[in-house]
Amino acid sequence: MENRGQKRMEVVEELPADKRACNSQDFRPSTSGSSVQAQANDTNPGHENVDADMDTSSSASPSSRSDEEEQEEQDKEDSDYGSCDSDEEDPRQRVLQDYQRQRSSGDHGKLKSLLLNLTGETDPSGQLSRLTELCEVLSFSTEESLSSVMANMLSPVLVKLAKHENNADIMLLAIRAITYLCDVYPPSVEFLVRHDTIPALCQRLLTIEYLDVAEQCLQALEKISRDEPVACLNAGAIMAVLSFIDFFSTSIQRVAISTVVNICKQLSSESPSPFMDAVPILCTLLQYEDRQLVENVAICLTKIADQASESPAMLDQLCRHGLINESTHLLNLNSRTTLSQPVYNGVIGMLRKLSSGSALAFRTLYELNIGYSLKEIMSTYDISHSVSSTHPINACSNQVHEVLKLVIELLPASPVEDNQLASEKESFLVNQPDLLQQFGRDMLPVMIQVLNSGANVYVSYGCLSAIHKLTCLSKSGDIVELLKNTNMSSVLAGILSRKDHHVIVVALQVAEVLLEKYRDTFLNSFIKEGVFFAIEALLSSDRGQQNQGSADLSQKPVTKEIVKCLCQSFERSLSSSSQTCKIEKDSVYVLATRIKEGFFGPEVFNSEKGLTDVLQNLKNLSVALSELMTVPIDAHVLHDEKFFSIWNQIMERLNGRESVSTFEFIESGVVKSLASYLSNGLYQRKLSKGGPECDSLPFIGKRFEVFTRLLWSDGEATSSLLIQKLQNSLSSLENFPIVLSQFLKQKNSFAAIPNGRCTSYPCLKVRFLKAEGETSLRDYSQDFVTVDPLCYLDAVDQYLWPKVNIEPIDSVEAKDQAIECQSSQLQSTSISCQAESSSPMEIDSESSDASQLQGSQVEDQTQLPGQQNASSSETSSEKEDAVPRLLFRLEGLELDRSLTVYQAILLHKLKSESEATNDSKLSGPHNITYERSAQLGDSRENLFPPGSMEDDEYRPFLSYLFTHRLALRLKGSSHPPYDILFLLKSLEGMNRFLFHLISLERINAFGEGRLENLDDLRVQVRPVPHSEFVSSKLTEKLEQQLRDSFAVSTCGLPPWFNDLMDSCPCLFSFEAKSKYFRLAAFGSQKIRHHPQHLSSSNVHGEARPVTGSLPRKKFLACRENILESAAKMMELYGNQKVVIEVEYSEEVGTGLGPTLEFYTLVSRAFQNPDLGMWRNDCSFIVGKPVEHSGVLASSSGLFPRPWSGTSTTSDVLQKFVLLGTVVAKALQDGRVLDLPLSKAFYKLILGQELSSFDIHFVDPELCKTLVELQALVRRKKLFAEAHGDSGAAKCDLSFHGTKIEDLCLEFALPGYTDYDLAPYSANDMVNLDNLEEYIKGIVNATVCNGIQKQVEAFRSGFNQVFSIEHLRIFNEEELETMLCGECDLFSMNEVLDHIKFDHGYTSSSPPVEYLLQILHEFDREQQRAFLQFVTGSPRLPHGGLASLSPKLTIVRKHGSDSSDTDLPSVMTCANYLKLPPYSSKEKMKEKLIYAITEGQGSFHLS
């Protein structure tokens, strides 16, 4: 079917200049450029890839599911089938069965007759006629038409005819009949084998006379090899199908290799010659370009290596055949053939087995510089995709794990027994030290990078094991320089602070080896970087006293496979003792003691002093900074002078000749002192509106202004240094846990709490006990009860309160009302769960703190899909029920009410478990005590509501810094990470408000007389790139957590997950935030993980996100009234969770292309200046007046036009409502908009407050003027305070030499004379006395009240689709990328890397080279037109060309005899460009430009 579809695509070429869209049958581009026979297509078995997945996993079981699961599914299928039967269908079914019986009987009779005729026929023409008829009958027969007797009788006859020497047609038809017989009646294979069919077919392949006969032999052998691989092997089928493989087409070559794959599954090491002789041919085939062919060859070689792994002689023979040389080419990232992940991992595993058993392979890998290839793999592979946190047993099938196993195999341990192979390997490395040094130079840096990146415990253990072996083997000083350059001491210090004993033991072993071999180099470094401190901490804590190795075994899933302990996960084979941990009980304590006593004795290290000179100096500066807190807060000058002096000394140390280590930076206390000084200690307190702490906020703003000036005085260098130090400190100190869930089998459970209902996942067993001393509550009489793990503690409160309360509820209503008010206003972007009856594992798409803090969340869990907004209309009585009245404790510690029961228990358990924990121990039973809540619930009220602090110019920055402050539970028992997080958040805020803070500093300097010229107020800032605030370690942890689908779907996520994303989203990469956003906003309907897909046969060992099954709705749009169509679409589907596909009136075709173009057209329609939505910027429209362009353009992007409160703007507001809905729906469906919004408008979307300085992003010239006027007002005010009004009158307050009164400014908004600046009228003139009111009026009209209604309208429209609060985790640039895709289109490197050439074209075809040159010559507008022509949108999604799905494909277009007269055509749903083979580049450019300009605006079928 694929080729027929392809044929149709190439022949039917109507309207060539028009874009093509898919009809109801989606177009799927072929991966092959050659046309093959129907039989060849039939023999490309779909099961090959499945086999590849299974076979490349060294620990995979044959079945992807357990027997019980299969039986349950079979029972379900039987039940479903039975439910479909009815009396009405029985007669039709009987008729069908009668027809099938009659047909089978007729076919059987025909076959019998043909068999008799063939047996007695000797005339070649008669035999040919009978065979033709036999093939026709067999091709339409069913299995019921044949029997074993018939197959047994047919087999010898067909085999005899297949050996016919004189007639090629008889041979061909006989072999074709054999092929059909295997297809129709698989049991016939046994009879065919019995009658020597395989030798006959092999003979025809070894002496090829007729190509079509040979091809048919390959088809037949492929069928037979599926059921009788051993017989094929013994008959020499491997060499038969491979001997002349070069003579066949690609499709037939695939059939031949499929035969070899089937045979290799049943290889036996007892008879090596049949498959060993084939290795040279297979190695040659690895050089071919066809991916499917090369993958199957790689699978064959992997199987052969498996069988030969026990024989060093056979492994050596494989190496001599060139297996290693050809295999390593496949690992090259620039290889012509890209292998699938399972096969790629299998090749790496094959190399490991070769190296393990063959000294020749070991030497060859080193001589080929395998370290470079492995380094490239490790450095480009996403560490977050490393060993699956849910399936550690399947880690061997993971790419990073396989690489590490090969690395460890290439570093042999010193032979302690009579092991000749190990001795040969070691002597080779001793005699070739340069090879080992090169291997170390390649691998050490990347392994240390992996250790620093937050890799899980399995990968960390592998890296450390390899480093330990490398340090033991190395005999030269090169390794010392490498370790010093990669700061190994700091890495070890961080590793030793972890909780897993396996990792700690290896880290201590590495430290011991380094001290033994290179004591002089590393002794001081270990002290400076904190290794000695970490060792002492181990000795003084319980981590060093007991072995917690068993903690890792708790991570194993329920499986029939043998699970290795972590310390054996990189060993070569499973053993009967693989579950026994090798670590002795006190191994950590013994090792740590030995290192301390052997290398850090009293004569070497004074433990009482315990400080380096650098650390002591920094400690003194930290104390001085803390003492500065005692100076009165309003003493600005004194504060500035002392802070300048202290900070300059700190920076001198950080930039000094002797570097400051991460350990010294942390231990000095500088971070805590700086955080306390800048925030005046508020960052550690709970703030409340109107509290005494708020009085100090203006002074705090001043401190941050001064600190900004200090950090950015010499560009971004100083700030970057501080950020890097803080990032290193955070990576070293943070121990945020990763929750490893095992995929518990879904089962029906009953949750008594909160509302007694069935769940499809396990419940928690909890016993609620009244707290000791609690007298106002009664005992809860029941024993253990089942609790829904997804409900919030407030729901448990709501359930228990009536059962344990003694006094009437009215007595507590008064104190509850305050909480009601606070709870109703809270917003959040955290991921919460909603277990709807239809899909209990989904993630709630309407997430807010209100829903989290209210027990009504549980009621919402069973609501119908159409009632998702019902919670917004809950009654006041329901709110009262949600007020927290009980306080819950587990083992004496209070549980956090903002979490689910599962999360609250999880948070408690994580404090005492290893760094990567498992949820199997969380099901219970648990004893939770309850008592009356004595205080109001924690509230994150807005300390900066609109209208507050009107005279405080620092309000936007302080609002950003303190409104969404760090959750106090992040503080925990460890202060340094909390201090670091606050400083990083502060620096990111300063970086984000850099123009604001620097402008304020300049205005104050002008006011104080430190600046004399208004031109000196001009600010040019260089912010630090956002990427510097991203913590790679936390991002990798977040990625790993998001990949754990069960934890995500059940809210089994550690609390830091939501806390950090809510308060410090800058710490995470844009890609990680995007995944979080989609889960939080849209839930598992958009990205759904299926636990049942993670069986042992999944060689990735990881959860595969698959597209959710959201329903699709088609919408008919009208191009002439595009906004009206958009309004109708949003009215119908805006608040529904459906994917919309657009088709146009009087046009055929629907799908991705028309839908993307629809959003592009709507985007342009919203830019119509006649709508009155946006500010005008006529100067930017080059060569076209606004009224003729139809699209408003602005140098700063689109920003709402100000409208006064008295203006009639209902139409404009409706347009903004529609715009908000369209934007939200585009985000929900993953569509790209072509809407150039200004940065300031994005800030409004994100809920940020704008100030006068944000006008810089709307109208830079207006902002410049306002800043200068503000500086004059500031100078006047300060002189008046110092010298009185008479003194102020004497100072120079002119505007560039002109008095304010002489400027003749009216009280009207510049550019909008109809907008009066209250309380004055347009007739009033501006003077020095009312200048401040004039400035406030302009700012208010431009970015505050003048646009407030428009912004509220936009947000209300957006909230109809999903909560706009979910966007708050992004910054303005990221939000623009989310909405509008990439700003840059594409470069030539991207074009070469991410465009596919097929169906007649390759990357070296002349027409393709013409096209690449033309694209390179295109200007930006032509590139946009080309993209819209091919994809439907002029913008690329985030990630550029690489993110296009399907991939942009260029194929040859077959049209008329003269290609130069044809136009290119496209299929936008597949991003498919059909390009005629033009005779010249000039002709192609002419036709392409004509097509992309004139071919827009309509869709027709190809």
UniProtKB/Swiss-Prot annotation:
The active site is at C1469. InterPro entries: ARM-like (IPR011989), ARM-type_fold (IPR016024), HECT_dom (IPR000569), Hect_E3_ubiquitin_ligase (IPR035983), HECTD1/TRIP12-like (IPR045322). The keyword Transmembrane does not apply. Residues 1128-1502 form the HECT domain. GO terms for molecular function: ubiquitin protein ligase activity. One of its GO terms (biological process) is ubiquitin-dependent protein catabolic process. Pathway: Protein modification; protein ubiquitination. It comes from the Eukaryota. Residues 22-46, 849-875 have a biased composition (Polar residues). Residues 1-21, 91-107 have a biased composition (Basic and acidic residues). ARM repeats lie at residues 143-183, 186-226, 228-265, 267-306. It is an enzyme of class 2 (transferase). Keywords: Repeat, Transferase, Ubl conjugation pathway. Residues 1022-1096 are annotated as: K-box. Residues 67-90 have a biased composition (Acidic residues). It holds the Pfam family HECT. Probable E3 ubiquitin-protein ligase which mediates ubiquitination and subsequent proteasomal degradation of target proteins. This is E3 ubiquitin-protein ligase UPL4.
